[in-house]
Amino acid sequence: MRHLRATPSRIGFGLLSALLLSAPLSAKAFQVGTPLRMDTNITEAQVLEAQKGWCKGLLSISEAYASGGFAKAKATANQVLDQAYAYQYGPVAFKPTLTVSPQTFRPTKAGALAYFVGGDPNFPNDTGFAIKPWKNCMVRNQVIQLHGMFATTMGNVELTNEKGAITTVDKTWTFIREPDGSIRIVLHHSSLPFSAAK
């Protein structure tokens, strides 16, 4: 006759089976509280707010220059870049409107700062786009794409100066949503609208 040895694993399984069969099952045993959630998806509302923030930042640099000169404008631009762009994490794909080779692209914060306020001998062609007397900034989107924690927009930005003249630029942005919920620019391409020769 073959004998089955009562190994610890068999004993444990038997006890567990007995407990499960004898214990009354209730719905309460399986109830859990509201689950904690983490959502890293960027929303359209967040993108639109980030665009408004960019316009507000540009106007604040212009206002700082008008009221306090270059030093105040540079300090303000530093803050705007830290809040709006992701330079603290690495290079940003930034192609400003009015830059020329060999400094067309501005992947570093220093290059972006020079474009916005000028005054950097390493970027001698920059005169300070953001210190011009801008009074209004309006974003007009043609495309908004949402891809998880990233979003890309394409459209126009209309800038109005103190005399009421409007400058329109073609604008493409890519935004990233940080774990803390903040939205920053990782790609910024800007150019003047193309006019075909007649």
Residue ranges and their predicted role:
Residues 28-87:
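Short, low-complexity N-terminal intrinsically disordered segments enriched in polar/charged residues
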Residues 1-8:
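N-terminal secretory signal peptides that target proteins for export/translocation
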Residues 48, 68-142:
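A solvent-exposed, acidic/Ser-Thr-rich amphipathic alpha-helical stretch
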Residues 8-9, 139, 170:
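Short beta-strand-initiation
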